[in-house]
């Protein structure tokens, strides 16, 4: 049933939050970062009267998926972190909740393929590393990211 599914989802979110709070290593890319946020802001619809889809609450921001806030963000990305040069790509329509965006601080500057700065942040909270960037793992030592 929907009620059982919701309860199981709440348990899973609590387990993820406890794992992150206890220092567990989490690399959250795009949808993973959204899952770790406080919630997803939605438009009301005929299917739901809720305007917020609650998430795990590990990271201190909301993500907007409201029609008025949606815009396509895509491209190749690169940045340096913990002595490694990381490359990847970004593709999403969701955005950080506009009221909180100014207070979010990235742990590094992210660049596009032409080495021009972009506004994509990379967050670090305890052993959680999160960003919209999907990383290419073939040339990096993932465990060094958590040092």
Task: Show the residue positions of the predicted features.
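Short hydrophobic-aromatic micro-motifs
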Residues: 28, 88-91, 128-133
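Short amphipathic alpha-helical segments and helix-helix/interface helices
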Residues: 13-17, 143-144
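Single conserved hydrophobic/aromatic residue that forms the stacking wall/gate
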Residues: 1-8, 12
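Acyltransferase
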Residues: 120-147
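Catalytic nucleophile loop
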Residues: 17-39, 134
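Feature representing long, continuous alpha-helical segments
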Residues: 14, 31-34, 54, 117
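Pocket-forming structural segment of enzyme catalytic cores
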Residues: 38-117
């Amino acid at each position: 049933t929907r009620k059982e599914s919701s309860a199981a989802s709440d348990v899973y979110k609590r387990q993820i939050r406890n794992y992150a709070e206890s220092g567990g290593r989490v690399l959250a890319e795009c949808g993973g970062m959204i899952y770790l946020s406080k919630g997803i802001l939605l438009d009301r619809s005929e299917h739901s009267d809720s305007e917020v889809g609650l998430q795990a609450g590990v990271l201190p921001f909301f993500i907007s998926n409201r029609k008025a806030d949606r815009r396509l963000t895509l491209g190749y990305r690169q940045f340096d972190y913990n002595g490694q040069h990381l490359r990847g790509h970004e593709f999403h329509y969701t955005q950080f909740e506009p009221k909180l965006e100014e207070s979010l601080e990235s742990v590094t500057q992210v660049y596009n393929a032409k080495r021009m700065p972009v506004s994509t942040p990379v967050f670090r909270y305890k052993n959680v590393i999160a960003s919209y960037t999907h990383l290419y793992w073939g040339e990096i030592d993932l465990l060094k990211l958590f040092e």
